[in-house]
Design a protein with these regions (language model features):
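Catalytic machinery of carbohydrate-active enzymes
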Residues: 1-228
């Protein structure tokens, strides 16, 4: 079987890291010439099945419509109450999996800690006061570890901590993945850094505001969930 993933440029480093054997084409949908190249490729290759998981955009719907068979994710019939990630498994016709949470026992020492306080949903951002408390706690518990804060919002940065400015570019994504690799403990409030950290088998603290269901983690993950 042959697969092709189409994605924005900032997502290609993630595909290359975790699905290195899969063909991936990154493009800017606001660039007409790049869109025409993808359009020409899809007409020539004639794929059998098209999916656009988690996407409701017209561009992704347009591209998968070139396949012999396709179903827009926005039109997928799903139960009114279902796990966010289980929806995609059903959409892609993947087998059901049991959901297991194994509590993580934190190590006695961490030298490098990465904190990602920002979420795509601003209501789920890590509050400033809690961020300050976390930094103080880590400094006491782990004898002044090297703490890095990664965010697009400069107000999240703190004196005494390294700062990493997240940007929507491929280079920034590559640097962010490398930063997670070099960190021993990851703290986040969003599923993006969460899944990257788990895929790289990093110790993780996830602070999640109310969602339904409350815990949405991959099977077999090791972490502590704190609901704000």
């Amino acid at each position: 079987k042959k697969y092709l993933i189409l994605c924005p440029r900032q997502m290609k480093p993630h595909v290359s890291e975790f699905l290195p054997t899969i063909e991936c084409i990154a493009f800017n949908k606001r660039n007409l010439f790049e869109m025409l190249k993808v359009d020409k490729l899809l007409k020539k290759r004639m794929f059998d099945i098209g999916f656009n998981p988690w996407s409701n955009g017209l561009d992704s719907c347009y591209f998968i419509s070139y396949c012999d068979k396709f179903l827009f994710y926005k039109d997928f019939d799903k139960p009114s109450i279902i796990n966010h990630y289980q929806v995609v498994r059903r959409y892609l016709k993947l087998p059901e999996k049991d959901w297991v949470i194994n509590e993580l026992i934190l190590k006695e020492s961490y030298k490098k800690i990465l904190i990602c306080p920002q979420s795509t949903d601003t209501n789920r951002n890590l509050p400033g006061e809690q961020l300050d408390r976390l930094i103080l706690d880590f400094q006491k518990m782990y004898n002044q570890p090297e703490i890095t804060i990664a965010s697009m919002d400069k107000s999240d940065f703190r004196d005494g901590c390294n700062k990493f400015i997240l940007e929507k570019t491929a280079h920034s994504s590559e640097q962010f993945i490398d930063l997670i690799k070099k960190s021993a403990l990851i703290v986040c409030s969003d599923s993006g850094p969460l899944h990257i950290a788990l895929a790289l088998k990093k110790d993780l603290l996830a602070f999640l505001r109310i969602t339904v269901p409350d815990i949405i983690i991959n099977s077999g993950s090791c972490l502590i969930i704190n609901k704000l």
